[in-house]
């Protein structure tokens, strides 16, 4: 009798483990990571911008500001874009006023500032929020591991860089203080 109970318990335990493994596997499959291509946004000029048009390209997404100590990075971003745009790199700027109110301008004022001061020709999107309760869906994707599959992060300041591979997946988050021309960034572009 005791032997029958033990055999019954072992058989039941194996069945439970098998069912738990199947549930875990299904759960992981249903948490498929998203990609950047699902997003459509507005440019500074109120035109539609569809990230799906960038399939097959490396994308650097940067939150920008016009009145920040890091604003001169616009020049490096533009030089990088000029150098590598024909090698499948696209830089996409998102002006944001989240840090010390360093992007107070309207979309039209930001567009004029970028063109006159830095000759910016890479795509610049309409001003958004990159953190807080009103965080834009693009930045929800960039900062939440459950969406991007890489890591949870928080935008720490203006000019934080998010590197997206040719499949539309986040592969690296770069500090605002790291210049766009840093070896780490150049290596990623050329890699």
Model-derived features: positions:
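N-terminal "domain-start" segment that seeds a small globular fold
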Residues: 19-52, 72, 137
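Short, internal strand/loop/helix patches
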Residues: 108-157
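Thiol-based oxidoreductase modules, predominantly thioredoxin-like and allied folds used
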Residues: 63, 88-105, 120-132
